[in-house]
């Protein structure tokens, strides 16, 4: 049966740790593996980091730049080199590829989100392997994915993939960073988000010298992907052939089981495609109504409003301790909501001077996170 497979490979797997130069043998094996999967009738997407790391090596820089303008310039240098290597390797295997550069704003606007989906659909139908990266050269901080783990999970969610492989510099998830804690406990299978939270995994968030994605970003990416029904695996990037073995049933790496009832595409867009512009702190009654009964959010349940937003913007819903429980599209601006929070819906027209929605966020526009 044909599968849709998204593979993300990080800078730490693509480059030599000492020099930042491309690890050509790893990339060649990756190209062979992905081409083989395509020949078996699967649809394959590669999300590749490495543009900044390769650019650093090309320009003789000894560490990843911190200044945004310099980093964007270095990414422009590295992206061309990276794609040339991919194109040369895949061409020898008679496998066409396509470069797809995305920014967060491509997923924020619903129309552009659907356009991206349609582009992927056409490329996959043509038998092409899209090679995806964040468009670091033009991305701004407010609208960045931040790391390609998140980007790969959003792409996997968008195309409703069957598998997401996060290739990294460790062989699986551990209870602590095995590079600094030798007796860290390996974790082979995570069956639910609750189990993931209960593990309280003490992982490093620093990432490698040349990359941006630590283990915490991979856990966050897994959360996004399994909500979309995508089975997610964290495994060693130096051994791309393990992808074939895992698909055939071997339990290599850490597996995250997908949710049995995936969230709808529109709600996934609300939860993960949009960038929240505000926060609503809720009382315990509102939290119970949303989480346990699937109700809409009413103004009476809102205790505090933070941030500035307009109607139909995305906001985070938080408990009194600041833990996120949901996201949604709000029916009122922050200015109006500050006036009606804590009040009954029947008082809205009197307070605001116009007849608005009874709900702050309707349940159709609300998704638990």
Curated annotation (Swiss-Prot):
Any matching Pfam family: PUA
Keyword tags: Amino-acid biosynthesis, ATP-binding, Cytoplasm, Kinase, Nucleotide-binding, Proline biosynthesis, Transferase
EC number(s) on file: 2.7.2.11
Molecular function per GO: ATP binding; glutamate 5-kinase activity; RNA binding
Residues involved in substrate binding: 49, 136, 148
Domain PUA span(s) in chain numbering: 277-355
UniProt: ATP binding residues: 8, 168-169, 212-218
Protein name: Glutamate 5-kinase
Major location (coarse): cytoplasm
Matches recorded under InterPro entries: AceGlu_kinase-like_sf, Asp/Glu/Uridylate_kinase, G5K_ProB, Glu/AcGlu_kinase, Glu_5kinase, Glu_5kinase/COase_Synthase, Glutamate_5-kinase_CS, PUA
Any Gene Ontology CC annotation: cytosol
Function as written in the Swiss-Prot or TrEMBL entry: Catalyzes the transfer of a phosphate group to glutamate to form L-glutamate 5-phosphate.
Catalytic reaction(s) noted: L-glutamate + ATP = L-glutamyl 5-phosphate + ADP
Associated pathway: Amino-acid biosynthesis; L-proline biosynthesis; L-glutamate 5-semialdehyde from L-glutamate: step 1/2
Protein family (similarity comment): Belongs to the glutamate 5-kinase family.
Subcellular location: Cytoplasm
One example of a Gene Ontology biological process annotation: L-proline biosynthetic process
